[in-house]
Curated annotation (Swiss-Prot):
Involved in promoting a consistent pattern of asymmetric cell division and fate assignment, perhaps by regulating apoptosis of specific cells, including in the Q neuroblast lineage. Downstream target of MAP kinase mpk-1. Transmembrane segments: none annotated. InterPro entries: WH-like_DNA-bd_sf. Keywords: Chromosome, Cytoplasm, Cytoskeleton, Kinase, Nucleus, Transferase. The keyword DNA-binding does not apply. GO terms for cellular component: centrosome; chromosome; cytoplasm; midbody; nucleus. Residues 72-164 form the DEP domain. GO terms for molecular function: kinase activity. This is Target of ERK kinase mpk-1. It is found in: Cytoplasm; Nucleus; Cytoplasm, Cytoskeleton, Microtubule organizing center, Centrosome; Midbody. GO terms for biological process: positive regulation of apoptotic process; regulation of asymmetric cell division. PANTHER family: DEP DOMAIN-CONTAINING, TARGET OF ERK KINASE MPK-1. Residues 52-61, 214-224 have a biased composition (Basic and acidic residues).
């Protein structure tokens, strides 16, 4: 049919519809716009993304409409978090911390109970652990240890609930369909209904309805991009500001702890100086009422010792293995507390179920000895590394003059009574808290050693020398002998004095007094917090100090007046001897000279003028 003939027939709609009968086949649907065009389209055509339907969707029987919200997955996440928090509150009524294994158990139980709401691949404990990792990143839960960045499913890792801030959840979902032209709106709505069954976790900070069309208005695109960028930047600012506030609070808390430690150190030193007489304190921080100077002094002591978050630890699975071995092995069961305390003293302590790989069969005594010896070696290696092979012992080298005077005046004095215990309590409180905690763990380990005979002889299972019927005494001596060089400064005490000092520490811990503040110290702290100063209770002696002076008398008046108690008058001396005594007094009172230089000058004076030394400076060296 030609085109001229076609246009010659008039078009009448009624006639056309009357011609088409009921049995006439209907014409095919009109193809989409642009298919039959001969010329190239103005815009490049984009084919729709192929979206596979979900497994539980039925292609043929799609009679039941799906009325799910696009925030269904977000609601599911909120329900999971609410269930998790309720379960934690029921499980831990009085404690705010929970273990990684408990968190994984709770979330796995929820997923198993609501398995119909999750894809088949997302059911199981491994997916619960993955979700807990996401919660840890989004601050829904927080690790107790700051260096723990990854969630660990273990009984030895502890967490706490975080804030209720919005979080960006990242899950593996099919790629979302992109918007097309208006002609594809029907297919897009069907595909969106199918994609609702993916259980995607939505977040208000995820950009949605992004358009790749080049024909959109640039202002709208800029507005959308700007709003999304603002949301993301707001989230980043919120998280960064919260982290900064957290760091500030932690820093302020640490500063308060340091100042409190400095006050305890200062007042403990004052009370200790009322029990012992020390001539030179240049190596010890002078007792001044300045908490900042004392705090910096304690920080310098703590900086010499290798303690902190950088210390190595076992893998959580290895720790679980050690727990199981110590609690269930028949050879270790009776000494399980001793081994657990050894693990507190040496976190890297680890041994296999069969520590000896040799041809001959190991006896039970030998195997237990190897385990006990491995525990002692692990503690020794840790202290050796922590103290730099004893150069920075747990009782700092700066306290050597105090320890020496405690040994000479209290330990050697059989009639010292409670003075020795009180002095040990004061000098223990003067040690910085992290080091004090390590000393307390060692004392507790020795205390457990004294209470059990289940630990094998640490010298040898076949030791043929003289043995004490109570095996623990020999083991205590072995432990003290191998660890004392890392506990005390070198040369400040003899071996016998070190044994008595450690026995005093153990006795104080058995009575519950180790680490506790004596009544006099508590009253001094209260008086200082209320009045800002303390009225020092002086001894019965004559001196020139003021009534409210805090420092003991021998540090508040000139050295000449102190020495005048035991020294003779210079009236009967000739001019030369009087000048020599005055010169030595000026040397002792000179603050610019070091302790070594003063001792050297006194030794030379004693060598060349022994009579003057014995008359005016007895016992100064």
């Amino acid at each position: 049919m030609s085109s001229s003939r076609h246009f010659s027939i008039p078009y009448d709609e009624d006639v056309v519809h009357s011609v088409i009968l009921e049995n006439t086949p209907s014409p095919p649907p009109k193809p989409p716009r642009g298919i039959l065009r001969k010329e190239a389209p103005m815009k490049p055509q984009r084919s729709a993304l192929k979206i596979e339907p979900a497994r539980d969707d039925d292609k043929e029987n799609n009679s039941q409409p799906q009325a799910r919200s696009q925030f269904k997955a977000k609601d599911t996440m909120e329900q999971m978090q609410s269930y998790f928090k309720r379960s934690i509150s029921v499980l831990r009524k009085s404690e705010e911390h929970f273990t990684g294994a408990e968190a994984a158990d709770i979330l796995t139980a929820y997923i198993e109970t609501h398995r119909n709401e999750f894809p088949r691949d997302n059911i199981g404990r491994s997916n619960a652990v993955k979700l807990l990792e996401i919660w840890l990143e989004s601050n829904t839960i927080q690790s107790v240890e700051s260096h723990q960045k990854k969630f660990v499913d273990s009984e030895r890792t502890f967490y706490r609930l975080g804030g209720d801030s919005e979080s960006l959840y990242i899950v593996n979902t099919p790629i979302a369909s992109r918007n097309h032209d208006d002609s594809a709106s029907v297919s897009r709505s069907e595909s969106s209904r199918r994609s609702n069954s993916i259980k995607r976790l939505f977040s208000p900070f995820v950009r949605r309805n992004r358009s790749n069309s080049r024909g959109r208005d640039k202002d709208k695109d800029n507005l959308k991009d700007g709003s999304s960028t603002n949301l993301k930047s707001t989230w980043s600012l919120f998280s960064s500001s919260s982290e900064k506030n957290e760091k500030k609070l932690k820093k302020a808390e640490q500063q308060l702890i340091k100042e409190e430690e400095a006050e305890v150190y200062e007042l403990s030193l004052f009370h200790l100086l009322s029990l012992i007489d020390v001539e030179f304190l240049e190596d010890v921080a002078l007792p001044v009422q300045d908490s900042k100077n004392n705090a910096s002094f304690l920080s310098s002591i703590l900086g010499k010792v290798g303690l902190g978050a950088s210390e190595e630890r076992l893998d959580p699975h290895q720790e679980d293995h050690m727990d199981l071995l110590i609690e269930t092995h028949p050879l270790i069961r009776d000494a399980s507390q001793w081994f657990q305390m050894a693990r507190c003293c040496a976190p890297l302590l680890y041994f296999e179920a069969k520590p000896v790989a040799s041809n001959h069969k190991t006896s039970h005594n030998e195997q237990l000895y190897l385990w006990c010896r491995a525990a002692l070696d692990a503690v020794k290696n840790r202290l050796e590394k922590m103290t730099q092979n004893g150069s920075s012992p747990l009782f700092p080298s700066e306290f050597a003059p105090l320890l020496t005077k405690i040994a000479q005046q209290l330990i050697n004095d059989m009639d010292s009574g409670e003075k020795l215990s009180t002095a040990v309590m004061y000098i223990f409180l003067m040690v910085p808290h992290p080091i004090r905690k390590t000393i307390d763990q060692l004392v507790q380990w020795l205390q457990l050693t004294m209470r059990t005979d289940a630990v094998e002889d640490l010298r040898s299972p076949y030791y043929l020398g003289k043995k004490d019927p109570r095996r623990y005494k020999e083991n205590v001596n072995v432990i003290i002998g191998e660890l004392s060089s890392f506990i005390f400064p070198r040369g400040c005490m003899t071996n016998v004095q070190q044994d008595i000092f450690i026995e005093t520490l153990v006795e104080l811990r058995q009575k519950g007094k180790l680490g506790q503040r004596p009544a006099q110290l508590e009253s001094s702290l209260r008086a200082k917090s209320v009045n800002g100063q303390i009225k020092w209770q002086r001894k019965e002696r004559k001196h020139n100090s003021l009534e409210g002076d805090l420092t003991p008398v021998r540090y508040t008046v000139r050295r000449e007046s102190i020495r005048s108690k035991t020294s003779k008058s210079k009236d009967g001396l000739n001019e030369t001897d009087s000048a020599l005594v005055t010169m030595i007094n000026s040397v002792i009172d000179n603050k610019e000279l070091s302790l070594t230089e003063k001792k050297k000058q006194l030794m030379n004076f004693k060598k060349f003028y022994p009579k003057l030394y014995n008359d005016f400076f007895p016992g100064m060296i």
